[in-house]
Amino acid sequence: MKTFKFFKILLTFLFVFVSTQSFAKTIKWSMQGDSLTLDPHAQNEGPTTQVSRQVYEALVTRGLDMTIEPQLATKWSTTDPNTWIFKLREDVKFSDGSKMTSRDVVFSILRAKQRTSDFKEYISTVSGVEAIDDYTVKVTTSKPNPILLNQLSNIFVMSRDWSEKNFAVTAQNWDAGQETFSATNAMGTGPFKITLREPNTKTVFKRNKHWWGDMKDNKVTEIHLLPIKNAATRVAALLSGEVDLVTDAPVQDLARIGSSSAHKVNSTAQMRTIFLGMDQAADKLRTGNTGDNPFKKKEVRQALYQAIDIEAIKK
């Protein structure tokens, strides 16, 4: 059995919290946005994924040192460059007490490959997935894929029975505004389950008594997510004690928060690349009044690059 720290479960880049709590039973957590949907395959977006990770798990995950670690799979191997064999944990249950088996993994990977899934590009090389037995899954790729484990760390496993019962076998079409049961309800194998959902206001997570893991910070039995869009208001809520944990504190406020004896600033590495994209193809920009598209000119793109203070970003 593996021990997980509460912060590892949140899997965030930078967070500040009230250090005097040593963590109470209920943690009030805030960030800028809320989850767009509870469907774990519908939207690949920061706050949405953070919420999903409290409830759902994948075959593998990344540790705090960014290495690939077992999660629902205990081990894996390749029999040839295009064939992967995953051995699953045999003590995993969903939060309703039902067992997780290879049929749930097969269902989830195929669901994540659907047209409406926002995670389909992660597993675009997966050409087949098969349950060898209750706790063995074979994944076949159309070509060698050395980063498949990294990609599978983002594919959350759902209960096939729960999805079929609630007409949620297809990933929510979020772009079309589709409303589905899986968009407003969640049931996974993770350390928490959702007991209250008020979008953009409050989401309550309670400990999943069926979780296979062992939470080191076992005093935490409940988490209240309270999204606060305005950065200044969010920081004020932290400093006043209205919330205990903020996972996206503004950089300019970190020194002030850290100077408080009642608060602590922690940071971890993360697998994320932020980039600036420019439309170099269109003759005219979709917005603005510049006339011809300036980004078609190499000199303009170079000027934009020179204007970026890279050293300041590094700091």
Where do the PLM segments sit?
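Surface-exposed binding/hinge segments that line
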Residues: S77, E121-A171
